Amino acid sequence: MTAKPPFKVIIVGGSIAGLTLAHCLSKAGIDYIVLEKRKHIAPQEGASIGILPHGGRILEQLGLFYLVEEQIEPLHTAHQYFPDGFAHTTKAPQVIYERFGLPLAFLERRRMLRALYDTLPDSSQVLVNKAVTSVEREVSDLMRVTTYDGSVYRGNLVVGADGVHSRVRAEMWRLATSQSPGVFPEHEMSAMAVEYACIFGISSSVPKLQPGEQVASFNNGRSYLTFPGKNGRVFWFLLLKLDRKYSYSNAPRFSSTDAEKRAERFADDHIWAGVNFRDLWKSKEVFSFVNLEEYLFQQWHWERIVCIGDSMHKMTPNTGQGANCAIEDAAALVNRLHRALKATPDGSSLSSGDIDDLLGEFNRARSRRVREIYQGSRMVVRLQARQNLFLKLLGRYYLPYRGEVAADAASKIIAPAEHLDFLPLATRSATGWHQFKPGQSKTLLIPFLYPVVAFSLCVLAWIGNDYLRNGVVFA
């Protein structure tokens, strides 16, 4: 009797999510292949990523976090700067480091991708220049993926780790609409929106920005984030409020000329310690100008297809959570696959019902986990761009005087994170994982918002009276 072939996962996208998933599957002994549409696994696009303790813990379980540490200057200080010249400094990054035993890390995205690729046990399982054109159901337990060059790949599960412009997501919707109408609400398929855009890049020779000290410079309708790293390099973001809210399909596209015009317009914006945006721009090595899509999809799977990472939860970069949520997605999915396959007699096959149950539970758990992170990201990008009077007051007159509110809020997000439950945890894990109890993060905003609302009502009343008397205007 011929042995049944092993369970196989087709990963579409050689992204942080996709390559982390490949590592997790490898550790679990589950077969996979990665299809990446680009010609190179780690192109230089000027992008950088933050690895927070919950993402770092999973990478450490995989034996990879040392590669991150080799590339970074750990963050220990956070500065905030406001248009009226007010500055605020905290040690929140250092506090988080001490609570969780892992630093807040910032590095080039391409270096992270290269590290993930180079350390795979068998890099021949990652194929480049393989743009997916279709995903089809073949027989009861197999899916067929076809690429632009006509190649065909078969597996038991297709995972879309192909980013915000996901082809797998589109194929999942197409198949579901034709075979199971109503599974995906029509409004959700067009709900992703764009209100912000971002010019991001890497610069060198900005000596006044010190390694390990991140800066958030608040401004009206825009904000700046800078992360000085090793060897004098600075990773930076200029986040811009657009003129209106656009749907995903109708959002404007930007060229290098558009970026040059914005850079000239905002050249005199002060960032920190005598550094203006012109100083970053004139020493740039590489940059890009992109839209910042925002949306959290509710339905992540259909039959033997599931999407993870930015294809399901796209956030702005202000909180640094995008890559970490993608890493968590990968770990959470493999935890469930590993358990399910171990429970089968042959360890190699899962019925359609098994898959549906597994993916449904994964979807529910990850949606609950990501929801507050996504909402926090939406709030922070608008807070730092001072989008309205309430957020101006909150950022300038309330939060700087709330002690460790930033570190505490981050800690309650980090602590409940999922890790690989079939691998040992690192020995350097610190007390914060237990101190900030899992399951409590969903109550975080309640005690926070009561004093915020009370404070804002008082200040609004004062501003209204003072404005009527004296015509006071706030920067």
UniProtKB/Swiss-Prot annotation:
User: What top-level class of enzyme does the UniProt entry assign?
Assistant: oxidoreductase
Catalysis performed (reactions):
(2E,6E,10E)-geranylgeranyl-triacetate lactone + AH2 + O2 = (S)-(2E,6E,10E)-epoxygeranylgeranyl-triacetate lactone + A + H2O
This protein's GO cellular component annotations are: membrane
Transmembrane stretches in the record are 444-464
Establish whether keyword Transmembrane helix is in the entry.
yes
Q: How does it sit in the membrane?
A: Single-pass membrane protein
Localization, per the record, is: Membrane
Q: Does the keyword Transit peptide apply?
A: no
Question: What cofactors does this protein use?
Answer: FAD
Question: Where does the UniProt annotation place the signal sequence?
Answer: 1-24
MF term (GO), any = salicylate 1-monooxygenase activity
Q: In which pathway does it act?
A: Secondary metabolite biosynthesis; terpenoid biosynthesis
Keywords on this record? FAD, Flavoprotein, Membrane, Monooxygenase, Oxidoreductase, Signal, Transmembrane, Transmembrane helix
> What does gene deletion cause?
Accumulates 2 prenylated polyketides including geranylgeranyl-triacetate lactone.
Q: Tell me which domain of life the UniProt entry assigns to the organism this sequence originates from.
A: Eukaryota
Q: Name one GO biological process term.
A: secondary metabolite biosynthetic process
> Which residues are recorded as binding FAD?
E36, G50, R109, D310, A323
Record EC number: 1.-.-.-
Return the similarity comment. Answer: Belongs to the paxM FAD-dependent monooxygenase family.
Role according to the record: FAD-dependent monooxygenase spyC; part of the gene cluster that mediates the biosynthesis of meroterpenoids called sartorypyrones. Within the pathway, spyC catalyzes the epoxidation of geranylgeranyl-triacetate lactone at the terminal olein to yield epoxygeranylgeranyl-triacetate lactone. The biosynthesis of sartorypyrones begins with the production of triacetic acid lactone (TAL) by the NR-PKS spyA using one molecule of acetyl-CoA and two molecules of malonyl-CoA.
Write down what this protein is called: FAD-dependent monooxygenase spyC
Originating species: Aspergillus fumigatus (strain ATCC MYA-4609 / CBS 101355 / FGSC A1100 / Af293) (Neosartorya fumigata)
Query: What is the gene called?
Result: spyC
